[in-house]
Amino acid sequence: MWSQVLGTLPAPLFLFLAGISFAIVTDKLRQKGLPPGQIARTTIRRGAEILALGLLFRLQEFVVSWGWAPWSDLLRVDILNSIGVSMILMGMLMGLGCWIVLSLTRISRPRLVLGLMAAGMAAVISLLAPLMWTTWRPRWVPWPLESYVNGVHNLNEPQSWLFPIFPWSAFAFVGLAVGFSLLSDWARKHEARTFALAGAGGIGLIYLGRWLNAQPVQLYAAIDFWHTSPNFFLIRVGWLLAILTAAYLWCRWGLAQSGFSPLIQLGQTSLLVYWVHIEFVYGRISILPKHAVDILTASLGLVAIFFFMLGLSLLRTELKGRRPEMLGWFRKPVKAI
């Protein structure tokens, strides 16, 4: 079971980290004294940009796969689409939350209020996911829209390989709640203790989710454990918190302190790395034949793609720093021979 759980974590990690980043941005905007409406517009606009990138990515994949990819692939709800929509939803919630914080002048800990609102939304999305995939399906809307709710696509049934709001956006809201917790005054004063509590809480959630799933009486009549179960959601949130704690240990006392860190470098160019690696792993220029390699060959392929993406990331960082110099070179007047 543990290996299967770990295999489901990349997408939750994307959304979880997007939520943490969103909390940092929202807190900075709030500290600048921006009104709630402007905070909402700024963050929602950024979410719309990510959604637009997701749609552009689908167009690119369709063009690359021209001749055998169906047109419906253009409307697939992929992970970038999910991140964009989740950011739009978080922007709406934070606009409301900041308005509440400003309206109620007695609130002394606004980050706590915003974090609790985010955690509550995560719980609501997770608890509604089994229903939105079954008895509460919005069948009355066109499938391209319903697909953002439950991943139905054009196949008349929710698909496990898509990333709809239910349940995936819940991970972004968990990240949002965790982000506000990490920004609190207490967490900043007791940094190591905060991450230790996060790790311990994560382990507790893992075992709580497993215990709840083992009970003879369940809340839902029909449920898909690996895709919509709130119990599995708790398990994955537990793993995310454990990974967050491990990342802190790595950056505070691990090899990341010795200088260059490949993981930090990849994280600084994560969108580019994601965009490019898809073609090498899943696309037409895949470095390995699909469904036809053993574990050793797949592992070697993983190592190869890791170093290739690391090189690409380093090149991107180098070119980014030299952008003014490169633009100046192109703008130089041509000398007569």
Model-inferred region functions:
Residues M1-I337:
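Alpha-helical transmembrane segments and their immediate juxtamembrane cytosolic regions
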